[in-house]
Structures are given as structure tokens and as C-alpha cells.
């Protein structure tokens, strides 16, 4: 036994002893020591001594499973050993025998331990790999495997790493990714034409984590026991070599074999072209020979040459951006578009944010420093020399995030429409992510009540109240008021911005239709979703005195002017708002805001009707409804409020029951049952359920 083999065995023994300790701390410490030992000698470029050339034997079981879309003129070979034979197959492909399988196993364990975050979350293909890990536990796609949480996958990863320290253990998909990084080569993972639903996650080219040169490609096949014409059970890996290499090996048995001449990675366009080489094939022909489902056949048929070329270009562009990021910086947009003009700007920025958020490179330093800056430092950062910090986009995003956190710290929730008016470049999803994080950091936050006296003028006042000034802006406005300050730049316009012309026109049109009495409440909510329900009832309460108030406005118009008319209208709406608030305040205990525990869930599944909710609300009162506003309008107001409350409670109960039964509905299904509930409300309730909150008690 050579000194190299003794060192490898010693490293494996130390790793096996560290496995017995709880957690991964001891194993990570042993991996750091093993890395120092293994870095003292590199992997050989060819076989050094050892036994003579072995007789190559074709694996008949793997050959019967060899797929049609795999590279031609290649044969799977028999590999001797125990377990899944992944490291033995790689050693045989590179050095002609399995002598270095233990060293490859040790190096792979070190790679997986020291770069655990990368393989679970950091790389571009991490979602595909994790999905493949879910399906590797079964022979076909199932809902149980699809819904495995990330914590379970991390536990499986840790268990697989510990098991890899021992010979004869079985390997998984992330072992292929780690082995590709250890060997600095691409691995062509060949998967049989079985288990068609999960095959795309396994039949793919796996690239190393980092590589400074154009890597060669190893071909390794998933082999095992065929169950039916459609299914097979994976048992081991088989090395795949070209026919020329087999002939050269048998022709030069007296000479020491050299490493096989590995073929370069085929371009993505050629790889995708193998799926549908003959577009004239019929479904019946493919169904008889390859057991292809009808949906898969028509999906392949729709993939034209142009579509495959676009997919190949996108594939190459994504990996080009990843390689440039690992070399120390992201390629600028103009340079990227010159190389890949087919890729859109939004796609480029999406990939860029994905790479910056992975946390696997030192390029995140400027972003982390920017997160720690205060508002004044962000303003001073505009003159910074670093392009990552001084770019306008980064400064704008940091300003928007700090502004939202500042408003929430002042117990004020900024609506998205007001936030977007101030920061038009921030998407809705980014806004809600920032708002959720800010709310978690402020547990004492208490939102304002929905029904208030000033609710009548909500569309005109929400935007003005929500846009609170910054600390620096307060000083600027004070200086401007005293006459000693400089005029504010365009970013710091006065915060009390008037509504745009189309919003005013929309509001006037809605008011006119409500006052005319031809617009019911349900149609008002569908036609004007941006206006609050309290606004409708304020206008509805003014409908009785509309001619008298209109004549009064016409009489006062010559003396008051336009501003006076608006003040009179606001005064009337405020007075009506007080009446509406009094009408919507029934005795204590009469309104039930949550669904009862014994409520039949079938009613929620079928979509609750408005009439049923009204009848239940009236029965709960036990007496005729009498509104403070008087007359039919006040009664309709209270009945509609009861219906809205019951409707929202049933929607919450429906989502909570479906969440508990692990069959959460999509927004399309939910909106079919509850059409008046906004999309943002659905996602807010969904996020609350997944965060562990309860929507309805009982």
C-alpha cells in the first residue's frame, strides 16, 4: 500500500469517527483538516503503476436501458464494487480501474461539507437538483415527493453526506454535482427512457461549481432493474465510453493505457435536437416503441427548431453570466446584450439578482455595505467611485427600502399604489417582500382600523397620509418654508401630491352614478375596485338630499369658486361619514367577525351566496335591522356590511381548511369561488398561513 492510499484511508477513518458526533460541526472540522491533507497531492492525470490493463466487459443490463437520445457509438461497461458504484465508475473512466474510488469519495465528502449552502441554494440548477432529489426517492412523480419541505431536503443532504464517508453507500444527484466540481469536468448524466415524468430532472449535463478552462465530459449512466415498460428502479451507475476507446483499449493491451479522449460538451441546440429528429413521426409509433405519453408527444411536436434555438441561447447566456460572476464581476448590460441580443433586459436583471442573492461570491460586498448605510450615507453614496454602490438603480432600491421601513416604524402602512407613485421602478413582489420583513422587525406595529370617520375621503387622503417625509426632507421643507433653503430636487417633490386627472375623472363619474341611484353596491365594487366601500355609502347617504345640495352648490358657485365647492363637498362627505359610521356600529356581540367552528365546510367549497349570508346575519340579530341613518339606505348598508364580513370569514375559513388538508388552492380556483377578493389579499392570507398564523379561530 502506497503512502497516498494510506493518507486517503486515514482521512476516511477520521471522517467516519466525526460522523458519530451530533450535528455537522465535528464533521465540518474534520473536513477542513482533510482538505489540507488532500490538497498536498493532486489527482493524477494518468494511471500510475498498479495492476495491468483490465478486460472491458459490456454491461448488458445497462445496454438494454440505453436511451435513443443519448450520444451514439457509446457502450456502458461493467464496473465491479459495492454500493451504487458512482466513484468506481468515475475512476474507471479516468484511470482505467477503480483504484482511486476511495480518494474520489473522500474529496466529494469534503466538497459537499464545505460548500453545503451552494448545493442547496446557491447554484443556478439548485431547484432542478432538489426536485431530482425528491424524485430519486421514488420511481415516479407523486404529490408527497413534490411537497417535501426544504428542511426535510437539508436533513436528507446531511444524512447522505454522513453515509458517503463509508464505502458501499449509495449516491444521489448531489453526489454527481459535487463529483463534477472535484474532477473539474462536465458529467453527462444519462437516464433511461423510463419514468418519463421525472426523467428531465436526471437526464442532463452537470457542470462543475467553478472551472477556469473548457472542461471535458464524462458519461455516466443510471442503471438498474427494469420493472415494466414504463418504470425502472435505479440500483447503480455504469461508466459509458465510446466504441473507439474500447477498440483502442483492446488493440493496445501490451501498453499502459492513457486516459480516454473525452468528447467536448455538445452544444445545447444539438442536445435538444435529439428529442425530435423526425417531425413526421406519429403518436402511435412512438407510443408503441418508447411508451411516450400523449401530452409529452404533443409538447415535443410544438418545439420547433426556432424554439429549440431560443432555449439553447438562453441556456448558454445563463451559464455565461454565471461564469463571469464567479470570475469576479457581472458583465455589464450593454456587453451582455451585444453577445446575446435575444435575451431581454428583464431576464438579465433577474439572473443578476439571483446571482447577487446567492451569497457565494465576494461580489456581494458592496451590496452588504449598502444595506448598512443610513439615509444620509446613501445620499452621499451617489458620489462614490464604486460602480456597484453609486449606480442609480441600487441607490433607488435602497432608498425605497429604507423609506418603507421608516414608515412602518412610525406605525403607518403605505399602500402599494402610493408607494409605486413615489418609486415607480419597484415591483409589487419586491414591495411585499420588504413590507413583510419590516413588519417582522416591528412586532409592535398596529394598523389603523378599516372603518373610521375619515373613511369617506379615503381615496383622496390615503396617498397623502401614507407618504410620510424622510428626516432629511423634513429639514428641506422647513428650510423652504422659512425661505432659507434650496429648492427641492425632483426626487423630493412636495408630498401632498394631487390625484392625477384620470383618477379625478373616475371618482367624479362614480359619484355621479351613485348619486343617480343606478349603480348598486356589487357593481360599484366590480367597476371601481380602487374606491373604498365606505365612499359608496357616503355618496349613497347623500343621494336623498342630492337636488337640494346641488342647488345650494349652484347658488354658492359664483361666490365660492371651484375651491369653495370642493370644500363644501368634503364637508358634506365628512358629515355623511359620521352618520355612516354610526349606522355601521351595531350593539356589542351582534356581529360575528369569524366563522363558527361548526360551520359546514361544504358551503365554503361551493362559494357562499350573498342571500344566505344576509339571512344568517338577520337571524343572528334576532330583531329587525334598524340603521341610524334611517330608511332603506341605512338598512341596506348594514346588510351589505354583514354580507361582506361573512363573505370574508368564509374565504378565510376555506383557505385555512384547504391548507390543513395539504391541498391549497391556486388563485384561479380561489377567485372562481370568491370573485370580490383581491389578488393581493389572497397572497397575504397564503403567506400568513405558511408563516404559521391562523386566519380563523376555531
UniProtKB/Swiss-Prot annotation:
Keywords assigned: Developmental protein, DNA-binding, Nucleus, Transcription, Transcription regulation
Tagged with keyword Transcription: yes
Protein's cellular compartments: Nucleus
Membrane-crossing segments per the record: none
Biological process (GO), any one: regulation of transcription by RNA polymerase II
Annotated Gene Ontology cellular component terms: chromatin; nucleus
A GO molecular-function annotation: sequence-specific DNA binding
Source organism, top-level taxon: Eukaryota
Protein family (similarity comment): Belongs to the vertnin family.
Job description of the protein: Acts as a transcription factor that regulates development of thoracic vertebrae.
The name this protein goes by in its record: Vertnin
Gene: VRTN
Amino acid at each position: 500500500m502506497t503512502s497516498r492510499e494510506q493518507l486517503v484511508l486515514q482521512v476516511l477513518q477520521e471522517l467516519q469517527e466525526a460522523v458519530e458526533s451530533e450535528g455537522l460541526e465535528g464533521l465540518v472540522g474534520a473536513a477542513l483538516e482533510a482538505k489540507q491533507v488532500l490538497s498536498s497531492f493532486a489527482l493524477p492525470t494518468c494511471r500510475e503503476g498498479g495492476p495491468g490493463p483490465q478486460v472491458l466487459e459490456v454491461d448488458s443490463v445497462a445496454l438494454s436501458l440505453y436511451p435513443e437520445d443519448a450520444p451514439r457509438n457509446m457502450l456502458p461497461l461493467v464496473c465491479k464494487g459495492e454500493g451504487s458504484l458512482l466513484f468506481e465508475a468515475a475512476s474507471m473512466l479516468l484511470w482505467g480501474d477503480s483504484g482511486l474510488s476511495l480518494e474520489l469519495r473522500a474529496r466529494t465528502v469534503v466538497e459537499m461539507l464545505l460548500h453545503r449552502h451552494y448545493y442547496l441554494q446557491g447554484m443556478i440548477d439548485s431547484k432542478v437538483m432538489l426536485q431530482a432529489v425528491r424524485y430519486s426517492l421514488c420511481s415516479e412523480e407523486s404529490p408527497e415527493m413534490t411537497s417535501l419541505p426544504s428542511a426535510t431536503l437539508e436533513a436528507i443532504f446531511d444524512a447522505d453526506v454522513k453515509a458517503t464517508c463509508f464505502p458501499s453507500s449509495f449516491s444521489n444527484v448531489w453526489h454527481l454535482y459535487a463529483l463534477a466540481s472535484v474532477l473539474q469536468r462536465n458529467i453527462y448524466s444519462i437516464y433511461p427512457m423510463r419514468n418519463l415524468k421525472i426523467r428531465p430532472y436526471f437526464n442532463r449535463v452537470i457542470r462543475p461549481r467553478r472551472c477556469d478552462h473548457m472542461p471535458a465530459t464524462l458519461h455516466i449512466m443510471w442503471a438498474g432493474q427494469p420493472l415494466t415498460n414504463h418504470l425502472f428502479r435505479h440500483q447503480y451507475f455504469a461508466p459509458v465510453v465510446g466504441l473507439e476507446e474500447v477498440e483502442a483499449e483492446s488493440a493496445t493491451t501490451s501498453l499502459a493505457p492513457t486516459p480516454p479522449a473525452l468528447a467536448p460538451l455538445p452544444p445545447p441546440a444539438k442536445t435538444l435536437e435529439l428529442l425530435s429528429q423526425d417531425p413526421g413521426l406519429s403518436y402511435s409509433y412512438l407510443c408503441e416503441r418508447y411508451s411516450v405519453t400523449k401530452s409529452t408527444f404533443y409538447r415535443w411536436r410544438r418545439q420547433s427548431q426556432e424554439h429549440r434555438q431560443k432555449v439553447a441561447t438562453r441556456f448558454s447566456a445563463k451559464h455565461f453570466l454565471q461564469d463571469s460572476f464567479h470570475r469576479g464581476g457581472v458583465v455589464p448590460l450593454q456587453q451582455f446584450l451585444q453577445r446575446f441580443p435575444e435575451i431581454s433586459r428583464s431576464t438579465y436583471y433577474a439572473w443578476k439578482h439571483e446571482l447577487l442573492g446567492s451569497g457565494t461570491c465576494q461580489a456581494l460586498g458592496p451590496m452588504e455595505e449598502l444595506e448598512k448605510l443610513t439615509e444620509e450615507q446613501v445620499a452621499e453614496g451617489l458620489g462614490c467611485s464604486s460602480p456597484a454602490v453609486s449606480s442609480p438603480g441600487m441607490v433607488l432600491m435602497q432608498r425605497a427600502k429604507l423609506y418603507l421601513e421608516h414608515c412602518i416604524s412610525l406605525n403607518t402602512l403605505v399602500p402599494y399604489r402610493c408607494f409605486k407613485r413615489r418609486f415607480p421602478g419597484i415591483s409589487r413582489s419586491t414591495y411585499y417582500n420588504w413590507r413583510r420583513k419590516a413588519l417582522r422587525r416591528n412586532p409592535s406595529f398596529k394598523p389603523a382600523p378599516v372603518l373610521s370617520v375619515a373613511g369617506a375621503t379615503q381615496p383622496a387622503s390615503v396617498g397623502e397620509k401614507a407618504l410620510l417625509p424622510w428626516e432629511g426632507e423634513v429639514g428641506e421643507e422647513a428650510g423652504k418654508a422659512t425661505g432659507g433653503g434650496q429648492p427641492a430636487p425632483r426626487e423630493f417633490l412636495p408630498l401632498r401630491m394631487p390625484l392625477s386627472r384620470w383618477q379625478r375623472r373616475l371618482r367624479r363619474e362614480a359619484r355621479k352614478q351613485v348619486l343617480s341611484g343606478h349603480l348598486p353596491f356589487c357593481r360599484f365594487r366590480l367597476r371601481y375596485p380602487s374606491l373604498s366601500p365606505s365612499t359608496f355609502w357616503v355618496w349613497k347617504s347623500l343621494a336623498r338630499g342630492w337636488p337640494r345640495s346641488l342647488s345650494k352648490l349652484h347658488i354658492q358657485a359664483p361666490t365660492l369658486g371651484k375651491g369653495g365647492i370642493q370644500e363644501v363637498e368634503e364637508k358634506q362627505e365628512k358629515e355623511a361619514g359620521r352618520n355612516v359610521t354610526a349606522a355601521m356600529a351595531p350593539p356589542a356581540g351582534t356581529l360575528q367577525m369569524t366563522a363558527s367552528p361548526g360551520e359546514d365546510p361544504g358551503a365554503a367549497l361551493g362559494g357562499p351566496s350573498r342571500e344566505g349570508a344576509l339571512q344568517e346575519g338577520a337571524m343572528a340579530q334576532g330583531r329587525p335591522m334598524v340603521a341610524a341613518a334611517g330608511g332603506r339606505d341605512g338598512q341596506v348598508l348594514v346588510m351589505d356590511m354583514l354580507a361582506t364580513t361573512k363573505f370574508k370569514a368564509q374565504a378565510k375559513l376555506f383557505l385555512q381548511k384547504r391548507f390543513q388538508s395539504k391541498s391549497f388552492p391556486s388563485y384561479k380556483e380561489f377567485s372562481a369561488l370568491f370573485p370580490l377578493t383581491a389578488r393581493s389579499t389572497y397572497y397575504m392570507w397564503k403567506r400568513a398561513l405558511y408563516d404559521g398564523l391562523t386566519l380563523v379561530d376555531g
